[in-house]
């Protein structure tokens, strides 16, 4: 009897102790910054690390290859002063890994991060770990290498120049010139023209527009672009600031337009479970006439093994206007790739040199080697650009004003909800009003 | 022998390594998680005491309640079907196939060793539409029907998930219950047969009561395993369409690791554990009542 109650007492004590442990963690929790300001606006004010550790996503091998190429070529001197070292992370695990590393004080020098984390009110920035690239590059005199359009997009999305624009993508509708010509369709200038064109194409037995519904965001892009064309380029900023609500009629019209488009079957059969590669292939093998996608598709378009319809047959047009809307057709949707930040605590002079060297040379390196359009100036000659790439580059050079994407300014929970619920919206299981109401409720609760 | 097991110090020294490892890896994290459920935040932002607020949030959070419903529904339906099917197969092995059951047993058991993610992807392509249409829709088309986009509806996804779980685990329960059925003495079956009990009557009045202990263990085991389902539903359709097939485990994972809210994630874990306990105790209680009667 005695031993049993003793044992029970020990067990209870053990569990109570374990339950109290988090209090100790709480006391020491939160990275206290001792260098750099808490807004990340101190720019280069950190101490150099021993190696230039770079963490990139598994899904993006190009960035790793190009940085390695730079370290052996144009940036050899900087590499000798501070050697490059690569780390990888699966893109879906980014938030988890970065939060963990940051809380242990082991955040790499240059790393991919989550959008919400690096904003001024995000966990990383509030802990003083996000370096200000504009201040650092201006200080080194190399700020001119960042394209103004890219800088503007990065500042719009992240609330400051916190990310290196290794990619600069514009979005629009890629179309099969031959199929459209065969059906007597010209580039649609308005949404109604687009719907009519889709109708004609559907009758001709071709999938009018293919989208990867399994990922969610390709569908919300279309809804978002409708809203930007209908309400104007500040549509989503107004929602973030509370000046407008997603349940306002002009916004619901976007959800309704998407639902109607899907309901008419213009995305093809089984679109809600279609993955990205399948969708791109449907376009590149001529089964679909159009696809709304971004200029990252160029790598597939320029690949003769994947592109069966031929590069000269691929046209690009901006998302059409909406009748009576305040947006205009030349406001392209642009994004600057996944956020790649510099750890403010390690932003010493050697790191600034490395970053400056990247800013000077990455534009030309990536375009020449991998056909990737970045947000950096191309300083030098590039040979053998495909016509499609050249066309996109020309459009980017002529851009005045860009818009972001639908979820760009949302918190991570609402971002997730927008993608998961769009399947229900486009398969008729949720009405446009309900979709917007739920999303607005989430933004109000979490934003 | 007795002098070794009689000496408490020796017992402690022999047990200590495994016990320490077990405590550190299992008991401490469970206690830590229980403690975390009264806080809010993550390791980077720091933790803030919120008391029982996480628990009250859980019961007013529609996403959390939906995930709880998905977990419970999946657990109950999958358990009933799995154990019933497994029991039917076990009866088949014992009474119909007898000696020749080894080959059938092996084949039916085989899917159990396959990784659950692989099985989920397999079933996903079974019900696919469009480009690479799967056999299910091919059969429907053959009989003149139109292709059904199974994974675009909650009912379709849930049905596929349950079919998938049954296919991969009925062999396991069949073997488990088969072992239990073998324990029933031949003489009892013989004498029952002599008394005129045959087929269904034999099963209902003799076999089931005698195999009740193993049946109840299987049900408890199955409930606990299916309440914690994660990879099958995630790999099949990402918890979709929307979040209508996202169980509590998936919601907990997303909360803790995608939204970086460790406190609320721990709360969900605690509630899931409590749910498993409730189900287990309920089965125990009902079995004890049966034995007393």
Describe the residue ranges of each PLM region:
Chain A
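Conserved N-terminal structural module of periplasmic/extracytoplasmic solute-binding proteins
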Residues: 2-13, 26-122, 139-140, 366, ...
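A local structural motif
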Residues: 77-89, 107, 183-186, 260-273, ...
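C-terminal capping/gating helix-and-loop segments adjacent to ligand/active sites or protein-protein/ligand interfaces
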Residues: 239-240, 371-380, 390-444
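Glycine-centered hinge/linker elements that transmit conformational signals in sensory
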Residues: 240-271
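Extracytoplasmic/periplasmic substrate-recognition and gating elements
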Residues: 264, 305-370
């Amino acid at each position: 009897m005695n031993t049993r109650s003793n044992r029970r007492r020990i067990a209870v004590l053990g569990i109570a102790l374990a339950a109290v442990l988090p209090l100790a963690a709480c006391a020491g929790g939160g990275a206290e910054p001792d260098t750099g300001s808490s807004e990340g606006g101190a720019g280069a004010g950190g101490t150099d690390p021993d190696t230039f550790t770079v963490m990139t996503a598994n899904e993006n091998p190009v960035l790793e290859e190009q940085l390695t190429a730079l370290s052996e070529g144009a940036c050899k001197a900087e590499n000798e002063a501070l050697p490059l070292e690569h780390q990888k992370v699966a893109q879906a695990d980014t938030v988890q890994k970065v939060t963990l590393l940051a809380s242990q004080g082991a955040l790499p020098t240059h790393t991919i991060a989550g959008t919400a984390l690096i904003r001024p009110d995000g966990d990383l920035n509030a802990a003083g770990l996000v370096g200000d690239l504009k201040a650092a590059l201006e200080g080194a005199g190399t700020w001119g290498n960042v394209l103004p359009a890219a800088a503007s997009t990065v500042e719009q999305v992240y609330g400051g120049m916190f990310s290196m624009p290794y990619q600069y993508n514009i979005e629009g509708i890629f179309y099969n010139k031959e199929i459209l010509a065969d059906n007597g369709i010209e580039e649609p200038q308005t949404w109604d023209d687009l719907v009519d064109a889709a109708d004609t194409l559907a009758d001709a037995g071709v999938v009018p527009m293919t989208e990867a519904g399994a990922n969610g965001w390709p569908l919300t892009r279309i809804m978002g672009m409708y809203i930007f064309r209908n309400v104007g380029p500040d549509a989503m900023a107004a929602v973030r600031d509370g000046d407008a609500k997603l349940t306002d009629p002009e916004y619901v019209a976007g959800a309704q337009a998407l639902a109607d488009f899907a309901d008419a079957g213009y995305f093809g059969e089984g679109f809600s479970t279609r993955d990205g590669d399948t969708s791109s292939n449907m376009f590149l093998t001529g089964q679909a006439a159009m696809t709304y996608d971004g200029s990252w598709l160029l790598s597939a378009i320029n690949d003769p093994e994947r592109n069966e319809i031929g590069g000269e047959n691929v046209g690009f047009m901006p998302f059409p206007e909406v009748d009576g809307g305040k947006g205009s057709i030349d406001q392209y949707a642009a994004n600057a790739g996944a956020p790649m930040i510099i750890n403010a605590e390690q932003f010493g002079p050697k790191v600034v040199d490395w970053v400056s060297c990247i800013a000077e040379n990455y534009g030309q390196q990536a375009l020449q080697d991998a056909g990737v359009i970045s947000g950096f100036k191309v300083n030098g000659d590039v040979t053998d650009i495909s016509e499609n790439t050249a066309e996109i580059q020309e459009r980017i050079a002529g851009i005045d004003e860009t818009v972001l994407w639908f979820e760009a300014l949302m918190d991570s929970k609402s971002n997730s909800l927008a993608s998961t619920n769009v399947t229900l919206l486009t398969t008729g299981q949720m009405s446009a009003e309900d979709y917007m109401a739920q999303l607005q409720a989430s933004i109000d609760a979490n934003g | 022998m007795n002098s070794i097991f009689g000496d408490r110090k020796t017992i402690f020294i022999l047990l200590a390594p495994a016990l320490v490892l077990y405590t550190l890896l299992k008991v401490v994290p469970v206690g830590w998680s229980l403690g975390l459920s009264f806080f809010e935040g993550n390791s980077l932002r720091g933790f803030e005491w919120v008391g029982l607020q996480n628990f009250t949030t859980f019961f007013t959070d529609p996403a959390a309640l939906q995930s709880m419903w998905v977990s419970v529904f999946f657990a109950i339906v999958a358990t009933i079907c799995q154990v019933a099917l497994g029991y039917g197969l076990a009866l088949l092995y014992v009474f119909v196939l007898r000696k020749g059951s080894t080959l059938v047993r092996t084949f039916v058991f085989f899917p159990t060793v396959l990784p659950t993610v692989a099985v989920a992807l397999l079933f996903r392509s079974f019900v696919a539409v469009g480009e690479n249409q799967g056999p299910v829709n091919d059969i429907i088309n053959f009989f003149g029907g139109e292709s059904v986009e199974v994974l675009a509806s909650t009912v379709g996804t849930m049905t596929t998930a349950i079919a998938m779980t049954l296919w991969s685990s009925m062999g396991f329960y069949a073997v488990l219950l088969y072992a239990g059925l073998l324990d029933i003495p031949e003489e009892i079956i013989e004498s029952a047969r002599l008394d005129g009990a045959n087929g269904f009557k034999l099963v209902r009045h003799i076999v089931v009561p005698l195999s009740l202990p193993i049946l109840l263990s299987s049900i408890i085991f199955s409930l606990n395993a299916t309440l914690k389902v994660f990879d099958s539903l995630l790999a099949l359709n990402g918890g979709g369409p929307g979040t209508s097939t996202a169980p509590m485990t998936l919601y907990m994972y997303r909360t803790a690791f995608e939204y970086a809210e460790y406190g609320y994630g721990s709360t969900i874990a605690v509630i899931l554990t409590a749910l498993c306990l409730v189900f287990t105790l309920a089965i125990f209680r009902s079995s004890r009542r049966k034995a007393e009667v």
